A protein has these predicted regions:
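Core nucleotide-handling region used for phosphoryl-transfer chemistry
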Residues: 1-361
Length: 361
């Protein structure tokens, strides 16, 4: 099958040849899979076209967790009646997908966004988490399930004392209908199989382009001074105004949490807006998102964690072959959200070098 046909048929002409990386790998059960994985930071980030299984043609498309974007002007005109913002858990994105051969599922494979098969480091973490009945759900519904692997054992930058090593369902892709699942479908799956879901933190109501924060979870609200926010009178005339307000709310919560608990509470919130914008919208506290003061160390650390998630057990061998592999990887990922001049600045490079020398845990 030609690469152009793959791009047109499976990636909706939204990627280019340079965005697809060819792979041939052996799974944990010894199956050989060959195909292409997408590295473009859009809705197809990490998605794969598997061309061959065990050296035989067996075409199948696996949708990954889409790139989660900040607010931008391209979505300003979107009108919606409801937006539910869930907690943005700070961990590793894990995707479970079915591998088919001759019409039968022969293996359910976990991966991270940028890998075909999860690294041994991730497999070892998953052994410490409750993964049942994920494999059974994938097989029964012909579905790709997406989780956040988070908790004290997989702590990145946000301390989460409520979990040791847990999986929370954050997305799903129905292979049968070729569609990313809605919040209601995710909630139904979670309820039926007692899967964890991220906390629902902020509920927004909309009407004809106007938006109002209808409710805030007690998880956040207990840290807010009630006289500084009135949920019934905050009417926003645009998504831009709404997201700016949410940033301030999250910043205030984090400051109060730090004063009381000694640590910040949240990295931000995420809304599943597949129907409205064809993807996910994230909002982070002001102190995390601000770019004009340089790239926050927390953002650089997140990309370093991703590097470990993807290459963990292979880092030493990679470094011997390419000493700049780590820096190039982190810079490439940072460039998706930050201006290239800031990414290439000496300040950013110094932070990356300092973090590289830090212990993994």
């Amino acid at each position: 099958m030609s690469i152009n046909h793959i791009i047109e048929t499976y990636f909706d002409d939204k990627v280019k040849k340079k965005d697809l990386y060819q792979f041939k790998q052996k799974t944990k059960k010894g199956n050989i899979i060959e195909g292409y994985i997408c590295r473009k930071p859009n809705e197809y980030l990490g998605s794969m076209f598997i061309e061959k299984v065990n050296n035989e043609d067996n075409p199948q498309f696996i949708h990954s967790m889409p790139k989660i974007h900040y607010y931008s002007k391209r979505i300003e005109g979107i009108e919606t009646e409801e937006i539910i913002f869930h907690e943005k858990l700070d961990g590793s994105c894990i995707i479970y997908y079915p591998l088919y051969q001759d019409g039968e599922v022969i293996e359910v494979i976990p991966k991270t966004r940028n890998t075909v098969i999860a690294d041994d480091f991730i497999f070892n973490l998953l052994k410490k988490a409750i993964t049942y009945p994920i494999e059974e759900i994938v097989k029964e519904y012909n579905i790709v399930l997406m989780f956040e692997l988070y908790g004290v054992l997989n702590q990145h930058e946000i301390y989460n004392p409520d979990a040791y090593c847990s999986l929370a369902l954050i997305g799903a892709y129905s292979i049968n209908i070729d569609y990313m699942c809605s919040n209601s479908t995710l909630d139904a799956l979670a309820q039926k199989y007692e899967l964890k879901r991220p906390k629902k933190l902020i509920h927004v109501k909309g009407h004809e382009g106007l938006y109002m924060i209808a409710s805030i979870s007690p998880y956040l609200y207990k840290y807010l001074e009630k006289n500084k926010i009135s949920l019934n009178t905050c009417l926003f005339t645009s998504l831009s105004e709404l997201t700016q307000k949410i940033k301030k709310i999250l910043s205030q919560v984090n400051q109060e949490s730090y004063n009381i608990n000694g640590f910040v509470l949240t990295e931000g919130v995420v809304a599943n807006m597949q129907k409205q914008i064809g993807g996910y919208l994230k909002v982070k506290p002001e102190e995390i998102e601000l770019k004009h003061k340089g790239i926050p160390t927390i953002e650089i650390k997140k990309e370093v964690r991703k590097y470990w998630d993807e290459y963990g057990s292979k880092i030493e061998a990679i470094y011997k072959q390419d000493k700049k592999h780590y820096l190039n990887y982190v810079k490439e990922n940072l460039a998706e959200d930050f201006p290239i001049d800031i990414v290439e600045s000496n300040k950013t490079k110094k932070i990356m070098e300092e973090i590289k020398r830090m212990p993994r845990k």
